[in-house]
Design a protein with these regions (language model features):
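Residues lining hydrophobic/aromatic ligand-binding pockets adjacent to catalytic sites
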Residues: 1-128
């Protein structure tokens, strides 16, 4: 299971592994106060893509396409999250004010798609 939480929301035991998925450290948050298990800077969108998007909902669909292309080019960065999500809950921690149009939302969709693809591939191998 993959959950999402804003960096300013309190941690809970039900969060499972908490992973910060931002390239930049969130403003106004002390490292000692943010309860995370990992900070995957490399999984965040590139600086160019992040600046271009600028959290503009009108650019959301194109942002997702470009971000997914970036993720496709670096599977080593996200495969560990897929494995962790299979073992138990993980929570992607993000800093955006917009809960619907941010890289964590896109990343969750991407990871869930990869999990479904792997599951379907395994089923096909069992049937064959």
């Amino acid at each position: 299971m993959i959950k999402l939480k804003r960096v300013y929301e309190a941690a809970a035991s039900s969060d499972g592994s908490r992973v910060l998925v931002e390239r930049l450290w969130p403003r106004g948050v002390r490292k000692a106060s943010l309860r995370i298990d990992a900070w995957l800077k490399e999984i965040g969108p590139s600086n160019d893509l992040r600046r271009w998007f600028a959290h503009d909902p009108k650019k959301w669909d194109v942002f997702r396409e470009r971000y997914f292309a970036e993720l496709d080019s670096k599977p080593k960065v996200w495969k560990g999250l897929v494995q962790a999500a299979r073992r138990g809950p993980i929570t992607l921690i993000y800093s955006s004010r917009d809960p619907e149009h941010n890289n964590a939302v896109a990343l969750k969709d991407y990871l869930q798609t990869k999990m479904k693809q792997a599951k379907n591939s395994a089923r096909r191998k069992l049937v064959a």
